[in-house]
Regions:
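C-terminal end-helix/capping segment
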Residues: 58, 141-169
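Mid-sequence acidic-hydrophobic segments that form the walls
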Residues: 52, 87-94, 112, 116, ...
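Catalytic DNA-binding helix-loop module of base-excision-repair DNA glycosylases/AP lyases
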Residues: 33, 105-151, 177
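N-terminal polyanion-binding entry modules of DNA glycosylases/AP lyases
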Residues: 1-104, 108, 166-190
């Protein structure tokens, strides 16, 4: 990892926050929109969704009241529309208190988030890393991280999650930063 950090040098971490919502609901909406899409496609659909609501992320009640056909026309799949409505419904009903998440442990945050349809461990990890700014998150299910570790460590294939946990043990308590370097290494290869 040290040679990777030396090769890449200092990172502009503020660059990674550009375009990301400041509020928890907006961050989760953006995560759902971006699932299984390229960064460019995710950004386009997210911007179309925001445009439906006056160039902002709609509050939960507005998202629940939105016309499904308009949401689909913005580029959301039927499944993602369901996920966003489940998220909005849980926030609106108080079943998911987004304001309390900052005071919970990483595991508690993840458990709360994965109770929402369409939010899995990867989404919880991204939320912890980039919205709650938690310093020691390792998204073992992220294929980009696994591929970057494969390349950086000269492995014959991407390590499975358990092996990745072992390899990443020396990075504690800064695994989030290590992951940012790993993602950056993939970008610099392009």
């Amino acid at each position: 990892m040290s040679s990777l950090v030396a090769d890449i040098g200092a990172l502009d971490l503020t660059r990674r926050r550009r375009g990301r919502p400041d509020d928890a609901f907006g961050a989760l909406v953006r995560s759902v929109v971006g699932q299984q899409l390229s960064t460019k496609a995710a950004r386009t659909i997210y911007e179309r969704l925001a445009a439906l609501f006056g160039d902002r992320v709609p509050p939960p009640a507005e998202l629940l009241a939105a016309d499904e056909e308009e949401l689909r026309a913005a580029g959301l799949s039927g499944r993602k529309t369901e996920y966003l409505r489940d998220l909005a419904g849980k926030v609106e009903s108080g079943d998911l208190d987004l304001y309390s998440l900052h005071s919970l442990t990483d595991e508690e945050v993840a458990n709360r988030l994965v109770s929402v349809r369409g939010l899995g461990q990867w989404t919880a990890d991204m939320f912890l890393m980039f919205h709650l700014d938690r310093p020691d998150v390792l998204p073992v299910g992220d294929l980009g991280i696994r591929r970057a570790v494969e390349k950086a460590y000269g492995l014959p294939e991407a390590p499975p999650p358990g092996e990745l946990l072992s390899l990443a043990a020396p990075w504690k308590p800064h695994r989030t930063l290590a992951c940012i370097y790993l993602w950056e290494s993939l970008e610099s290869d392009k």
